[in-house]
A protein has these predicted regions:
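Selective transmembrane helix interface/packing segments
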Residues: 1-227
């Protein structure tokens, strides 16, 4: 909990400081913040939803992307060394946030009953097949989407944390053997540093993929009647 609060405080402080006195020609932290915000707007929101709907749902996609990004980053910060998303609670909350967003998008456009019908009923199917397809579509749309969002983020960050722990624990173990095994500490240390750099890439990719999937699910809800 303390790690999550600390990361949230760092994220809020970053954007408050960066955008406190915005300039027409950005520089410093404002430039970094605007580049990051433009990335979400152009490459996630507008890319998937188009300009009109993309701007409308920026209020969902921007906090989703940056919360995942900053919470993931704690896995490579010294003395923290574990992502808040390596535990089930936070990924589940983030997935539920996306879940509420895409259901809201569909209900807002079609109304509750039409949206539910459009989401689970595939037109022009034989009546008998509806008995099979409707439960599967309901499971896929309303159960598996938040579940897979949670599991994907949790598993990727947890696996990365475990590998880093193993590599640096092995480094410590081998180094203090003071025999032939000591030389291996250099190998595991180098592997740990290399994997830390790789984990930085994973941190960004997982934030991007998570926000991208939320955008895709919102888009599917907005076009639920287009089977």
């Amino acid at each position: 909990m303390l790690v999550r609060l600390l990361v949230a405080a760092i994220m809020i402080t970053f954007f408050v400081v960066a955008m406190r006195k915005p300039k027409i020609i950005p520089s410093g932290l404002q430039n970094v913040a605007e580049i990051m915000l433009d990335f979400v707007r152009i490459h996630i929101a507008e890319e998937i939803l188009g300009k009109k709907e993309g701007r409308r749902f920026l209020a969902v996609l921007v906090p989703t992307f940056f919360l995942v990004l900053f919470l993931n980053s704690s896995s490579v910060i010294p003395f923290l060394n574990i992502s808040s998303n390596a535990r089930a609670g936070m990924p589940l909350i983030l997935a539920l946030f996306g879940y509420i967003a895409f259901i809201y998008a569909g209900v807002k456009r079609y109304g509750f009953f039409k949206y539910m019908k459009s989401s689970v009923v595939i037109p022009n199917l034989p009546v008998a097949l509806h008995l099979l397809v409707i439960p599967l579509e309901f499971l896929s749309t309303f159960i598996l989407r938040p579940a897979t969002l949670t599991i994907r983020l949790l598993s990727n960050m947890l696996v990365g944390h475990i590998i880093l722990v193993l590599l640096f624990s092995a480094t410590n173990l081998f180094f203090w053997q003071l025999n032939g095994w000591t030389a291996l500490s250099a190998v595991t240390l180098a592997a740990g540093i290399a994997f830390t750099l790789f984990e930085c890439l994973v941190i960004f990719l997982q934030a991007y993929i998570f926000a991208l999937l939320v955008a895709v699910y919102i888009d599917l809800s907005l076009h639920a009647d287009e089977h």
